């Protein structure tokens, strides 16, 4: 072997690294100041979560992913996974020499008679057996690992999603590029062609992610070697056999005859679990930010008190996730037209609602903060995993030896995915609690029950069905929060007696992501409904005030002979009643004697009459005598005025514009209403809540919500407002 050179370098985090370099181009980085890598891990957590999400989105949208083995990100994996995204993979040419060196070492060592696991020995618990037929051993490895069941159809529940397969191929290439696995560079180029030409092998379940994801990865190897049972999906979704797949991908040199160690290099890694985990975490980070903004919008439409976001409260708790969540909500609420209006309302009648908002609103930063920390830590853990060398044995060319270890154990995946799934379930629980308050007229500060918007609430039950659906989603999400990693079974003749279940946990977390997307879309549609109802409420209240004022002036100002009447002083108190009374508690029949408006207006007149004293005995100055006249005229005019205001609202000709346009949350509302073409739901229309939620769910799944979401936070400077 050739001599080892040494060099001091700076790694990405600024730490001094001592690099052992050999002529075969293998680099082993060991930091003098951070030998255990804790510093690098901590460095990766610096800065805000939102900035990190923005970087993810930027990376996701780049047209090329350049693989070198050490800089792959979860957003790049997610981008490649979305096969219609148009992102291409390029391999770093500088990695070729290192890959070739490890491949050559395997062949040289075998020719010398060196005994190496998986090269001259059989696999797993039967590694006591030896063979000199290295190529035949690789072929048998792929054959016996093809143990999955396709079932009926090409896209059965036993076949992994195309996105997961594409992610797995990308991650496996990245691992093998580092030159510790003993595989030819040409095989990595072939897998790259499959990705770039949208040819996706069909992978089956059946892995415990302990000796890597053996069974699913064996189907990639099976396609590369031309096994007759191999299947792939072509660019248009058509089913291809191995030969057709190679033709479609432009691989012209025929199927590969695997050399010693190459089959093991392909299958003995964590790429399927970590690839799917990367997809999951990209979505989880987006949903985490969305939950923060949704909580702020919830505070707006619920007329919440913004002091729950005050920086001092969260500074005293110390947790960075909580501090950032509160700062983001504070930014959304700062200057909000809803917050300003709610402040006036609270000042006018401080007893109208509880002194403190309920927990789903008031403690939302404390609830979401730790969950965001979990998701962020899991993101970094998986990012380390997809840049790791995770097969066995590892070929250390510089020391002329094969290292037998256990980097294939996917515990970082299983643990990260279990933790992420628990965080997703807790986010879902918060959204459900907020949704339940929003649709309940006992809690929602004047909004109608079930957010129904029709003229006749007896024939409109709004989001009642949606609340039932939300309960279903939340229950399933909480069930999925149960850990996978506690269900380990000893496998492979007790050789794999502890195993990570990484892919299983990733699959369950993938399910959890979809459910949280269902919940987020349903909740945001409901929030937009509430925003529109607040707009309708404001216009209806304005019309009621104008009519009450008009009727009061006509009937209460003067007496029979035109003289000023004591009842003229009632108008101010009558208007105060209108201001304080929730519009939707009476608006379907505003002059009904059983509804609070007419009762309280009459009570104002009665109270004034009681203090009118001796003047009540005189018909010309009696306020009691005016009550019937006032009520009769109001009953004649008010219903017509209310209907006129409703008509103006429906035609887009409102007197008062929608407050949401003055709020930082407006981009999300605008996206839902204008770009997706949703509208206020009523029992008078045919369209159902589910149809509107479906539009938003599809948009969320397609990533279309990202831009309006980030636009809401576009001018946030990354810090809380100063404590004043």
UniProtKB/Swiss-Prot annotation:
Active-site residues, Swiss-Prot/TrEMBL: 117
Sequence positions that bind (E)-cinnamate: 268, 356, 362, 392, 464, 492, 495
Major localization listed first in the record, in broad terms: cytoplasm
GO terms (BP aspect): cinnamic acid biosynthetic process; L-phenylalanine catabolic process
Pfam families referenced in this protein's UniProt entry, alphabetically: Lyase_aromatic
Entry keyword DNA repair: no
Subcellular locations according to the entry: Cytoplasm
Key word S-adenosyl-L-methionine present: no
Positions bearing 2,3-didehydroalanine (Ser): 211
GO cellular component: cytoplasm
E.C. designation(s): 4.3.1.24
Keywords, in A-Z order: Cytoplasm, Lyase, Phenylalanine catabolism, Phenylpropanoid metabolism
GO MF entry, a single one: phenylalanine ammonia-lyase activity
Entry PTM: Contains an active site 4-methylidene-imidazol-5-one (MIO), which is formed autocatalytically by cyclization and dehydration of residues Ala-Ser-Gly.
InterPro entries documented for this protein: Aromatic_Lyase (IPR001106), Fumarase/histidase_N (IPR024083), L-Aspartase-like (IPR008948), Phe/His_NH3-lyase_AS (IPR022313), Phe_NH3-lyase (IPR005922), Phe_NH3-lyase_shielding_dom_sf (IPR023144)
Name of the top EC class for this enzyme: lyase
Chain positions of cross-link 5-imidazolinone (Ala-Gly): 210-212
Distribution of this protein across tissues and organs: Present at high levels in roots, with slightly higher amounts in roots with nodules than those without, and at moderate levels in stems.
Subunit and interaction comment: Homotetramer.
Protein family: Belongs to the PAL/histidase family.
Name of the molecule in the record: Phenylalanine ammonia-lyase 2
Organism: Pisum sativum (Garden pea)
Gene behind this protein: PAL2
């Amino acid at each position: 072997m050739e001599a080892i050179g040494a060099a001091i370098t700076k790694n990405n985090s600024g730490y001094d690294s001592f690099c052992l370099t050999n002529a075969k181009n293998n680099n082993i980085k060991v930091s003098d100041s951070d030998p255990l890598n804790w510093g690098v891990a901590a460095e990766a957590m610096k800065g805000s979560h939102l900035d990190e999400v923005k970087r993810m989105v930027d990376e996701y949208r780049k047209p090329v992913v350049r693989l070198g083995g050490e800089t792959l990100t979860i957003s790049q994996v997610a981008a490649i996974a979305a096969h219609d995204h148009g992102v291409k993979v390029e391999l770093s040419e500088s990695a070729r020499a290192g890959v070739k060196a490890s491949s050559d070492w395997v062949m040289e060592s075998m020719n010398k008679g060196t005994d190496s696991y998986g090269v001259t020995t059989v696999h797993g618990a039967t590694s006591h057996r030896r063979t000199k037929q290295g190529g035949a051993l690789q072929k048998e490895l792929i054959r016996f690992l093809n143990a999955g069941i396709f079932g009926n159809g090409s896209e059965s529940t036993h076949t992994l999603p195309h996105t997961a397969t594409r992610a797995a191929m990308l991650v496996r290439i990245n691992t093998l590029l580092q030159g510790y696995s003993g595989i030819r560079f040409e095989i990595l180029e072939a897998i790259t062609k499959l990705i770039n030409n949208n040819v996706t092998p069909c992978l089956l379940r059946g892995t415990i992610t302990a000796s890597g994801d053996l069974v699913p990865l064996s189907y990639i190897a099976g396609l590369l070697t031309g096994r007759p049972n191999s299947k792939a999906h072509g660019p248009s979704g058509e089913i291809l056999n191995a030969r057709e797949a190679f033709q479609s991908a432009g691989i012209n040199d025929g199927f590969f005859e695997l050399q010693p160690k190459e089959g093991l290099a392909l299958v003995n890694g964590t790429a399927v679990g970590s690839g799917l985990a990367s997809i999951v975490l990209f979505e989880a980070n987006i949903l985490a930010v969305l939950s923060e903004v949704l909580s702020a919008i919830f505070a707006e439409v619920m007329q919440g008190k913004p002091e729950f976001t005050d920086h001092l409260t969260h500074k005293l708790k110390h947790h960075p996730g909580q501090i950032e969540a509160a700062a983001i909500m504070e930014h959304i609420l700062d200057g909000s037209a809803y917050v300003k209006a709610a402040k006036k309302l609270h000042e006018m009648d401080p007893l109208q609602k509880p002194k403190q908002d309920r927990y789903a609103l008031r403690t939302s930063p404390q609830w979401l903060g730790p969950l965001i920390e979990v998701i962020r830590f899991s993101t970094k853990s998986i990012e380390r995993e997809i840049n790791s060398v995770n097969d066995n044995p590892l070929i250390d060319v510089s020391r002329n030896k094969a290292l037998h270890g256990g980097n294939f154990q996917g515990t970082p995946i299983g643990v990260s995915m279990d933790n992420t799934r628990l965080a997703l379930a807790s986010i879902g629980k918060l959204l459900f609690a907020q949704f339940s308050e929003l649709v309940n007229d006992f809690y929602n500060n004047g909004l109608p029950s079930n957010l129904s918007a029709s003229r006749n609430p007896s024939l409109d039950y709004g989001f009642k069905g949606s609340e039932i659906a939300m309960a279903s989603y939340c229950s399933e999400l909480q069930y999925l929060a149960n850990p996978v990693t506690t269900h380990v079974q000893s496998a492979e003749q007790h050789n794999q007696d502890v195993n990570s279940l990484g892919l299983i946990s990733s699959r369950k977390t993938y399910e959890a992501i979809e459910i949280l997307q269902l919940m987020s879309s349903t909740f945001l549609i409901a929030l937009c409904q509430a925003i529109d109802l607040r707009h309708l409420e404001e216009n209806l209240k304005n019309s009621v005030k104008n009519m009450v004022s008009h009727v009061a002036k006509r009937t209460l100002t003067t007496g029979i002979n035109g003289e000023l009447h004591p009842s003229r002083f009632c108008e101010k108190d009558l208007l105060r009643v209108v201001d304080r009374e929730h519009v939707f508690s009476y608006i379907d029949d505003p002059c009904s004697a059983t509804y609070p408006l007419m009762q309280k207006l009459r009570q104002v007149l009665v109270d004034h009459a009681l203090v009118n004293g001796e003047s009540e005995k005189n018909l010309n100055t009696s306020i009691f005598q005016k009550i019937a006249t006032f009520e009769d005229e109001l009953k004649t005019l008010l219903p017509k005025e209310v209907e006129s205001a409703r008509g103006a609202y429906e035609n887009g000709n409102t007197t008062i514009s929608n407050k949401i346009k003055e709020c930082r949350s407006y981009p999300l509302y605008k996206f839902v209403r204008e770009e997706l073409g949703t509208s206020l739901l009523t029992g008078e229309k045919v369209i159902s809540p589910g149809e509107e939620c479906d539009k938003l769910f599809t948009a969320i799944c397609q990533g279309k919500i990202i831009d309006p979401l980030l636009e809401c936070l576009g001018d946030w400077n990354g810090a809380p407002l100063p404590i004043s």
